[in-house]
Curated annotation (Swiss-Prot):
Subcellular location per the Swiss-Prot or TrEMBL entry: Endoplasmic reticulum membrane; Nucleus membrane
Family membership noted in the UniProt record: Belongs to the shisa family.
PANTHER family: PROTEIN SHISA-5, SHISA
Domain notes for this protein: The proline-rich region is required for endoplasmic reticulum localization.
Source organism per UniProt: Pongo abelii
Keyword annotations: Apoptosis, Endoplasmic reticulum, Membrane, Nucleus, Transmembrane, Transmembrane helix
GO CC terms: endoplasmic reticulum membrane; nuclear membrane
The protein, known as: Protein shisa-5
NAD keyword on record: no
Lineage: Eukaryota, Metazoa, Chordata, Craniata, Vertebrata
Biological processes annotated in GO: apoptotic process
Amino acid sequence: MGFGATLAVGLTIFVLSVVTIIICFTCSCCCLYKTCRRPRPVVTTTTSTTVVHAPYPQPPSVPPSYPGPSYQGYHTMPPQPGMPAAPYPMQYPPPYPAQPMGPPAYHETLAGGAAAPYPASQPPYNPAYMDAPKAAL
């Protein structure tokens, strides 16, 4: 037998053994399944524990800082002792400045009395102006 055949046989045996063990651990009739599922005895020691019930310290009552209405199913949670309170701003930030509306509108009367760069009246229609130029012969 060559090296490739020996390797194939060894790999096949390994895979079959792993599959057999997995099936045995999951099958209820196998002895490995029964030994793993059997409850282990609990070793107890004779240690006694004394529990002292002390009243839990209540935080001082703080009036709610939210000015809105309270809801029936909602209860505010008091802050935990030893934890810092959330920093609330003392005042609201200033509002944003209004956006500029663009350049002011143009008025001819405010232009300083300068003459218009074009005539105010429209010249009459001239069809000869639109004709193609004629080639000279």
